[in-house]
Amino acid sequence: MHRIAVPAATGAPTAQEPVKVAARNLDFYYDKYHALKSINIEIPEKRVTALIGPSGCGKSTLLRIFNRIYALYPKMEARGEVLLDNENILSPKYPMNRLRSKVGMVFQKPVPFPMTIFENVAYGIRHHEKLSKADMQNRVEQALRQGALWDEVKDKLGQSALGLSGGQQQRLCIARAVALRPDVLLLDEPTSALDPISTSRIEQLVEELKRDYTIVIVTHNMQQAARVSDYTAFMYLGDLIEHDRTETIFSQPSKQQTEDYITGRFG
């Protein structure tokens, strides 16, 4: 039986770590289609949690609920609770601007804005804070450093972001997300459109970013989940089948469905 090699586990089990995000009895509907079914999961603070499962299992849907991006589209409904620092972000009383500043998101395909590299990073900050020119410059530099991009673009901040390579554009999107200093960073298959070298750089970056951020990453690449995550959740047909330490999921899963998936018997 083929097993994916994983690093040795570090830190304490989920139950002993501070919980940053928690879904409680979460159901989600696309019109009448029941996409997520009574999901209960706790995301530990300043750890990387990977969501894995076959296409259509609900992992990207769950990710989008964590920042309520689904609310931009009609006929979508979430029921239950998603707690961020023990506050229910699904409540109509939870301010959307506050949520956007606390939960950043990076998508599968890099989406730089058609503006300069500097303005790409400054854009979100301007909508949430009023900074002096010097403070803005410092903030943009800090974000680009966190995105591991500063050394490559520091002399061309006034150039269009559209001229960057795909890997650079994705790191710019990460820098743009962390520029607001969120608590949580959501990554939806952030390397699926990138070459192996760019993928490796993003994975290294994820490892660095978890010192400051709680990270949830959706990936179809189980080797990637094994490399970058501390915890892994396996989803199938809208159900959360198993959630545990990554080392446990890939070496001693408790559910047969999980074992069948990670050993390539389906999916």
Curated annotation (Swiss-Prot):
Annotated ABC transporter domain residues: 21-262
Keyword ATP-binding assigned: yes
Keywords: ATP-binding, Cell inner membrane, Cell membrane, Membrane, Nucleotide-binding, Phosphate transport, Translocase, Transport
Main localisation: membrane
E.C. no: 7.3.2.1
Organism superkingdom: Bacteria
Chain positions recorded as ATP binding sites: 53-60
Membrane disposition: Peripheral membrane protein
Molecular function terms from GO: ATP binding; ATP hydrolysis activity; ATPase-coupled phosphate ion transmembrane transporter activity
A Pfam family matched in the record: ABC_tran
GO biological process: phosphate ion transmembrane transport
Catalytic reaction list: phosphate(out) + ATP + H2O = ADP + 2 phosphate(in) + H(+)
Gene Ontology cellular-component annotations: plasma membrane
Protein localization: Cell inner membrane
Record-linked InterPro entries: AAA+_ATPase, ABC_transporter-like_ATP-bd, ABC_transporter-like_CS, P-loop_NTPase, PstB-like
NCBIfam families registered for this protein in UniProt: 3a0107s01c2
Subunit field text: The complex is composed of two ATP-binding proteins (PstB), two transmembrane proteins (PstC and PstA) and a solute-binding protein (PstS).
Family: Belongs to the ABC transporter superfamily. Phosphate importer (TC 3.A.1.7) family.
Free-text function comment from the UniProt entry: Part of the ABC transporter complex PstSACB involved in phosphate import. Responsible for energy coupling to the transport system.
Stored PANTHER family: ABC TRANSPORTER I FAMILY MEMBER 17, PHOSPHATE IMPORT ATP-BINDING PROTEIN PSTB
Protein name, as recorded: Phosphate import ATP-binding protein PstB
Source organism: Xanthomonas euvesicatoria pv. vesicatoria (strain 85-10) (Xanthomonas campestris pv. vesicatoria)
Gene behind the chain: pstB
